[in-house]
Amino acid sequence: MHKKQLMALLMVPQTSDSQDATITKLESAYSDLESLLRSSKQMEQNIETMETRFDLLHGSITTASRRVHPLQSLSMSRKALDTRINRAISPALALLETFKLAESLQNNLLNLSSKLSTEKTHQKRLSKLLDYMDCVDQLNEAINSISEVVEPVIMRLQEVVEFISRTKAADQYRTQRLREALITLKALYETEVDEMRFEGLLDQALLHMQDEFEVLLLKLKHRKLGDMSHMQNGGEDCDDHFEVSFELGSELEIEVLRRISNTLAANDCLDICIDIYVKVRYKRAAKALMKLNPDYLRTYTPEGIDEMEWENLETSITLWTQHFEVATKKVLLSEKKLCESVLGEIIDGLIHPECFVKISDKIMAVFFRFGEGVARSNKEPQKLFKLLDMFESLEKLKPYVLEIFDGESGEDICARFRELEKLIIDASSKVFWEFGLQIEGNVDGFLPPPQDGSVPKIVRYAVNYLKYLSTENYRTTMAKVLRTELTWKTELMLSSKQSETDEDLLKHAICNVMEALQRNIESKRLSCKDKILVNIFMMNTYWYMYMRTKNTELGDLLGEKYIKESYKAVAEESAYLYQKQAWLVLVKILDQDDDDIKEQKQGKEKSIGRLVNEKIETFFKCLSEICDRHRSFYSIPDVDLREQMRDSTVKLLVPVYAEFLESYSGFLQRKVYPSPQRLQGLLGKAFGSTNDWNLNGGRNSGSLETDIRRSR
């Protein structure tokens, strides 16, 4: 910098005054430069001196480092040894603390057990049980912790002791202390740990909890089943009743049972827990159902069912439908909820469905086998209505069964339920169709009509049977059976069948049976030689069929036109033929246009009188015979039909008789014959009154000839 200033001064033009000043400045700059050079030289000397000192210091440090290095290695070894010992000692100390905790918990467990044994109040006892289980769970956790860490702790401690003994890294006192700690832990492991797990207070507590579990489960009883009439109505109210009223146990009881089951499962007692639960709850469920007195379930084979009297079987089936509903919708539904509440947390909820099915399987099997026995028994006609009751009951129960026994564990029960329903449907359809076949071909189709021409029992039975089947109680169920059967038989239904309603199916089926009944009647007609009896039989039978179906649900199903054409028309035709064959012969006897009378009119009056008397005598003789047959053999049980036939006969005979008497009264002076009014009374007596008529076919004895003679 001074050099630049000097050069600047030299380059500037100088005056005389300024030259002196410049020289002065130059001299000053020179002096400064000289001083600076001296300082630099001195500094160079100082630096050389410091370099020498640094070399000496570096040599000293190197020597010290060589002397300290062994001590540093020894310190690091000491720290590593301390770390290794601490890693073994710390878990051992924690293990000892856990032993102390386990000992404390065992003392608490003894105190709680003593208090629990003296407590009599149920609610307080349940609360103490919860405290007891809390202590058991804590003790179990402590013992499990000991069992998990004791072996690794012993192994680490043993490695440290062996290392110290081998390397002499610690003093004898410390080594001896570690060796004694190792021996103590080994002794605890070999004796107390297994005893704590399998033979100590924990094991006793688990046994005690098993007993408490069983006792508490036994206390959860199903309420009195009582009157089951409400179950016949169904509906939402009934469902709500099941949902609300049939819970088992209080919340506290359920909580205690749940805690016990979880604790037992956590202590390798799951199998014992399940065995106790299934045994006790099956016992309770079965005992509740036994109060309904289901003794009828003892008979379940088809052969045994066939041997039962019908009244007993009918009652048994009715009870079966009721009891099956109670068992499913009350008892087993309650058991499922209890099972889910108590065992639902074990193995992520996989246990409780299996347990519930074990409880339910035997109960459901008893009901299944009775239903299967009924379905496989003889297909007697009267069983149809009870089979339909069973089917309707199963249909109502189906959604409950499928919901209660959902999942893989309940598949077998659901499958057997569906199989039972199939058996009932198949049995119902077979009973119905075999009934039609029996009517047509076997029952009494080849026998002649009843001797009095009354309605055969098979007709009465069949008509009333079908009337009952057509009522609101059964027509829908029977139609559903027929529809299901048709679906089974044909995978691809014809279009005509697809459009056919359930009512059409039922109508077609009933028409088939009615037609079979008509063929049965026809076979009886053909086997009878008495034409009058045949017509009375046909008239009575078809009139009965018409009147019993008219204005009924069966008549509505068949249709008014059908029953008029099929039954009423036949009855009217038979009535006409009956009158023609039974009574028209009397009209012909008194026929005034008879050729004999015409011939006699051309002759003598005496001959006419004789012929008239012969005709009138023949008339009354035939009348007596016909009336006697009506009184003794022929029967028209229906009052209205009998009155109609009486009135029709009176209209047929009395006018002809009156005209004959009026025309030939002059030839009948020697004898007195009944008046037309008297004849009308005699005909009415021949047909009989309601009181005189024997509805079983028998008629009051005695001859009408006596009455005729008295009336003369």
Curated annotation (Swiss-Prot):
Sugar-modified residues: 111
Disruption phenotype: Abnormal arbuscule development (reduced arbuscule branching and aberrant hyphal branches frequently distorted in shape) during arbuscular mycorrhizal (AM) symbiosis with AM fungi (e.g. Glomus versiforme) characterized by reduced STR and STR2 incorporation into the periarbuscular membrane (PAM). Normal root nodules development during symbiosis with rhizobium bacteria (e.g. Sinorhizobium meliloti).
Pfam families associated with the record: Exo70_C
Chain segments annotated as coiled-coil in the UniProt record: 26-53
Entries under InterPro entries matching the protein: Cullin_repeat-like_dom_sf (IPR016159), Exo70 (IPR004140), Exo70_C (IPR046364)
Record localization: Cell membrane
Any single biological process term in GO: exocytosis
UniProt induction comment: Accumulates in roots, in a RAM1-dependent manner, during colonization by arbuscular mycorrhizal fungi (e.g. Glomus versiforme). Triggered by RAM1. Induced during root nodule symbiosis with rhizobium bacteria (e.g. Sinorhizobium meliloti).
Family: Belongs to the EXO70 family.
Subunit structure: Subunit of the exocyst complex that mediates vesicle tethering during exocytosis. Interacts with VPY at the periarbuscular membrane (PAM) around the arbuscule hyphal tips.
Record's function text: Component of an exocyst subcomplex specifically required for periarbuscular membrane (PAM) biogenesis during arbuscular mycorrhizal (AM) symbiosis with AM fungi (e.g. Glomus versiforme), especially critical during the early branching phase of arbuscule development; probably involved in STR and STR2 delivery into the PAM.
Stored PANTHER family: EXOCYST COMPLEX COMPONENT EXO70I, EXOCYST COMPLEX PROTEIN EXO70
Protein name: Exocyst complex component EXO70I
Organism: Medicago truncatula (Barrel medic)
